[in-house]
Structures are given as C-alpha cells and as structure tokens.
Amino acid sequence: MVPPVYIVSTARTPIGSFQGTLSSLTYSDLGAHAVKAALNKVPQIKPEDVDEIVFGGVLQANVGQAPARQVALKAGLTDKIVASTVNKVCASGLKAIIIGAQNIICGTSDIVVVGGAESMTNTPYYLPTARNGARFGDSTLIDGIQKDGLLDVYEQKLMGVAAEKCAADHGFTREQQDEFAIKSYQKAGNALKQGKFNQEIAPVTIKGVRGKPDVVVEKDEEIEKFNEAKLKSARAVFQKENGTVTGPNASKINDGAAALILVSEAKLKELGLKPLAKINGWGEAARNPIDFTIAPALAVPKAVKHAGLTLDQVDFFELNEAFSVVGLANAEICQIPLEKLNAYGGAVALGHPLGCSGARIVVTLLSVLIQEGGKIGCAGVCNGGGGASSIVIEKVDSDFKL
C-alpha cells in the first residue's frame, strides 16, 4: 500500500496582469510570499522542519541561480533545505506537487513545500548576437516570453496556432469558445463577489514610491477587466481567415505564485496537524507537440485510474484554460460535464502565470471542494512540447482522525 501524502496548507498571491500591480515583484518575491503565507497557516511547522522545496518556474532568464532556492531562503526557510526548480512549461507547478508527493512516499522527505511562480512581466528580451559580437548589420531582439514560454520549438509556431488546430480538429466554433470564456469570467466574478477566493489568496502589499502610499493587492487583477461586447468583437489573433482564437477567449500573460505544504502521515501525527486533503493519485502523458492542447485527455484518465476511481466519481475538475478550446475539447473527450469544470472560472478569467498555474489550479480545486461540498477533485494541465500532468485529491472531513 502506498503511504498517504497530505496537503495541510495552501496559499497563493493574487494574479497580476501583465505590467500590472505585481510588476515590481520578482519570481522569488512572488514565490516567497506564497510560501510564507502557506507556512503561516500551520505554525506547528517550524522553518527547520521543512526538508525540501520543489517549485515550478518557466521563464528563468535573468532570475538568477537556483530560483526555488531563492524562494526558500527569502521565505525564511533554513539554508539546509534541499531545493529543486521544475520547468515543465505550464505544468511546472503541478509537476512540482507530484515530485514532492513522490519524495514523501519514497521516505526521503517528511515535509515538502511545493508550488510555482512566474513574473512574466520581468522576462527579458534576448540579444543572441551579443555573445560573439554583431559584426555587421542589424541585430534582432528575441522576446523571452515568446521564445521560452509560448512558442512550439518543433514547428516554430505560437501556442495559439495549436489552439486553432484543436478548434478545427474538434469542430469548435468562435461562438462556442467565446461563450466558454464568458462563463469563465462570470464564474470568476461571482466567486470574487462571494469571497470564494478569500481562503486561498494572501494579499500582497506593494510599497509606495516617491511619497505615494502602499497599495494592498488582494484580488486577481484580470477578472474585473471583463467586457462581454469587446470579447465578442475581438479579432482572431493567430489565423487571419476563419480564425477562432482571440486574446479575450485565451488565457492572459500574468504574474503570480502558489504554494502548498505536503506532509507524511508520520509527521502529521507527530505535529498534530489538521489535513485539508490527501493526494490519491496522479498521471502524466504526452502526444504530438502540436496537439499538446488535448494531452490532458490522456493524463486525466491515468490520474483517476491511479487513484482507483472512475471519472464519474470525481466531483469537481480543474483544467487549466490555456485557451477556451482546451477546456472545451478535453471536457468533450473525457465526457466531463461542464458544470463540474472550473467552478470558480479558469485561466481565461484569472490569468496564467506559466510556472504558477499548475499549482494554482490545485489550490483553487481544494477551495472548490471545501466550499461546494465536493469530496474528490481532479486537476489537469497541458504543457508545451505535447505533455500534460494531472492529479487527484480527496478532501479530508473535519472529523478526520488517524
């Protein structure tokens, strides 16, 4: 029997818009804030108790050596902590959770901080010719966000081109994608108004400059930018003729971080910790890189099977909305009822900080299970290169006893 792994705390930053309210914060600033907030919820865990941190991060240029290590030390963890940074593109944060759980199961760690972060705003441009010297003519700047985050390296096509292929392959219209996006914004807006994100978001204080007061950021920045008329009239971005994917019906470029604290059963008993959820299983898969959009349709069933369940036993699903068509296509293939999917909206409305999102969807999934009466939840996220990662968690009841 596989030893259980428990989630005892979660936290995330609000998600900031590109060059928005969180733009002054670095990858490590964002990550450390989420980690501190998660640890503050479990005072029984002291900094010296944490064995390891596994943290996702995609756009690592100019971030500095060992980004996860920076997060750990900035969050106040000891210099003895083992730190690993994961780059599995959009699935990085979820892969970090899987690795943390595996290390606990293997007996090499008892308490692991996991999650991910991204400051897409602070990603630099590259000047490749500068290394050897530009001898003659113009030199071209390379956008780091596009090069390392949003471009299929094999076909040299943007991720949105793959989304257009997915829409064509599966027969999803522009109108269907717009409707999915509108519902994502509506669900996120309702969740915001009802305080559904309060237990997961740790407000961030941005220091005022030149005599200006500090600003407290406590909600996701994108949600309130929703304009249905503009969404429906937006031009297709990636395909001129008969294009269906637009800026508004796709995820956004964002900044943010999310963190979770995982513990073994032995450490749960020793410290008298109250678990929020148990990790029941996970699954990963890959296919042709240009079809990464539907890789979750392979990974999700594997995760559910690994957990010893069937898809109809899952109460709520979180699928990262890289594009509206990703949610639509994977839900159709896996026969997931849309009322079970992304109950509080998804990346279209909330934002998609690349290295953070895989962890963020698990944090939000747990919020949904707790507040909407669910027991079993499954999260899945596709990633550039053709892959996907998925995880199944089970909410622990308030009367839980070992």
UniProtKB/Swiss-Prot annotation:
Domain of life: Eukaryota
Keywords annotated in UniProt: Acyltransferase, Cytoplasm, Lipid biosynthesis, Lipid metabolism, Metal-binding, Potassium, Steroid biosynthesis, Transferase
Pathway: Metabolic intermediate biosynthesis; (R)-mevalonate biosynthesis; (R)-mevalonate from acetyl-CoA: step 1/3
Induction: Expression is up-regulated in azole resistant clinical isolates. Expression is induced by exposure to arole antifungals such as fluconazole, ketoconazole or itraconazole.
Intracellular or extracellular location(s): Cytoplasm, Cytosol
Binding site for K(+): 185, 250, 348
InterPro entries assigned to the protein according to its UniProt record, in alphabetical order: Thiolase, Thiolase-like, Thiolase_acyl_enz_int_AS, Thiolase_C, Thiolase_CS, Thiolase_N
EC number of this enzyme: 2.3.1.9
Gene Ontology molecular function: acetyl-CoA C-acetyltransferase activity; metal ion binding
PROSITE patterns linked: THIOLASE_1 (PS00098), THIOLASE_2 (PS00737)
GO cellular component: cytosol; mitochondrion
Catalytic activity: 2 acetyl-CoA = acetoacetyl-CoA + CoA
Chain positions recorded as CoA binding sites: 185, 230, 251
Gene Ontology terms describing biological process: ergosterol biosynthetic process
Pfam family, one: Thiolase_N
Active site: 90, 352, 382
UniProt xrefs under NCBIfam families: AcCoA-C-Actrans (TIGR01930)
Quaternary structure, from the entry: Homotetramer.
Family assignment from sequence similarity: Belongs to the thiolase-like superfamily. Thiolase family.
Function: Acetyl-CoA acetyltransferase; part of the first module of ergosterol biosynthesis pathway that includes the early steps of the pathway, conserved across all eukaryotes, and which results in the formation of mevalonate from acetyl-coenzyme A (acetyl-CoA). ERG10 catalyzes the formation of acetoacetyl-CoA from acetyl-CoA. The first module starts with the action of the cytosolic acetyl-CoA acetyltransferase ERG10 that catalyzes the formation of acetoacetyl-CoA. The hydroxymethylglutaryl-CoA synthase ERG13 then condenses acetyl-CoA with acetoacetyl-CoA to form HMG-CoA.
Protein name: Acetyl-CoA acetyltransferase
Encoding gene (name): ERG10
